[in-house]
Every structure is written in C-alpha cells, then in structure tokens.
C-alpha cells in the first residue's frame, strides 16, 4: 500500500429494471471527490469474469489501489469506477452460464442511477466499458451495440461474443 491519497469505495443499491429486485454495485470515487463539488468525472464501467461478482475488481484486482497510484503519479486523470454484478436473471431463468439480460440492466438501470447520483461528465466521450473474461465479452457486445453511449471498450482475456445478427463485426471494427 503506497503512501498516496486514496479514493473511496461505496456500495450503492438501485432497483433493477430487468428483475425488479434491489441490485448492488460498487463505486470508486477518486481522492478529493467529496471536496471538489463542481468537478464532474468520466466513468469506467468495469465488468467481472464468470463466477465472480461486483466485488472481484476490488478484492482480487485491487482496482481502487491501482487507480489511486496512477492518479497520484499523474498517469491517469481522476475517474469514477463502477463495478456491477454482471448478471440479471429473472426468478424462473436458469443461471447456468449466460448472464441474463445484463445489457438492459446496465443501460437502463445502473448507468442512469450512477448519472443521477454522482457528478458524471456528460456524453459518450466520458464513458467507457471494460471487462475480464465473461465481462470482456459483455463489454464488447454492449460497447459495440451502444457506440452512442461508450467511446472506449476494454477487452481483457476474452473473445467475441456469440454471433449476433445485428453485428457485422468486420464493419464495426473498421469504424
């Protein structure tokens, strides 16, 4: 643990538009967030891998400590980091592997909640999505399907999602 200013980790709860249940997400706010009352911040929505949950990037990945150090060394500007459980199953759905309708969960649940509660810089240029393993597949599919919402996509140890007829991957990657 380096002697640098540290941000905060906050657990938030909102009602899922997919399941109707209360859902938790974790939000990293950079050092000084609570004192910089007029500053707005870009957001990275960071997705976990299969078998993990919204706490994986904090407890295993130490994403908050990595950001603290990058910000202190001026290698990264202060951002908000949102880590959400990448699943959205209805009570009668089989949660064996696929994450349910997580796309709707993120786009119509988590993002509006975060943008209402936190000082988020407006527009797609200030919103990114990234993930590991299953989270990378989700990030790629959601990011490519909503290029009006996300300016950057990070894919870590993942692949292309299952074929979706609305995506012509070759054309999308060329754009």
Model-flagged regions — what are they?
Residues 1-175:
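Non-catalytic cap/lid and distal C-terminal segments of serine-dependent acyl enzymes
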